[in-house]
Design a protein with these regions (language model features):
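A cross-kingdom feature that marks ATP-driven nucleic-acid transaction machinery
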Residues: 5-6, 10-146
């Protein structure tokens, strides 16, 4: 489907390690109507549609778009050290410009807010970090500059 320009592949990028990861890529439909038809109009999750729409808009604006991953070290309930992988929905590059974007249809709970913002907080550079939410929301910056 990629050869027919129906889907586009987005590679996984290790943000801290600054390299591409050899894990499964993510695919986005170039036409959401064809996506829905392919799925027989059964899966209309607004979160997936919104993420696909954002990807298409970023590509239209000339960005190279990857899926980001941030690896962190944490302690589990037993106090043992473990590695966790946090996802960043989009790592967007155009020339020297880089933007990190999280897509969240709704941030109704504290847990969901923490999940969406945590990966962006762990990126220690001065590039722009954005969380795009569904619906009509006022634009604002939090204390972390996100």
């Amino acid at each position: 489907m990629q050869d027919a320009f129906l889907t586009e592949r987005s590679l996984r990028y290790d943000i801290k390690g600054r390299k591409y990861i050899d894990t499964p890529s993510k695919y986005y439909f170039e036409d959401l109507g064809l996506r829905n038809a392919r799925l027989n109009f059964r899966q209309s999750e607004k979160t997936h549609l919104m993420e696909n729409l954002i990807y298409n808009e970023l590509r239209l604006r000339g960005f190279a778009v990857d899926v980001g991953q941030v690896t962190i070290n944490t302690k589990n309930a037993d106090g043992k050290s473990e590695r966790k992988h946090l996802d960043v929905d989009f790592v967007c590059n155009k020339g020297y410009e880089r933007i990190y974007i999280q897509s969240a249809f709704a941030l109704l709970t504290e847990e969901k807010q923490e999940q969406e913002f945590n990966s962006l907080r762990r990126i220690k550079d001065n590039k722009q970090k954005i969380v795009i939410m569904g619906g009509l929301q006022p634009t604002y910056k939090n204390n972390d500059g996100i």
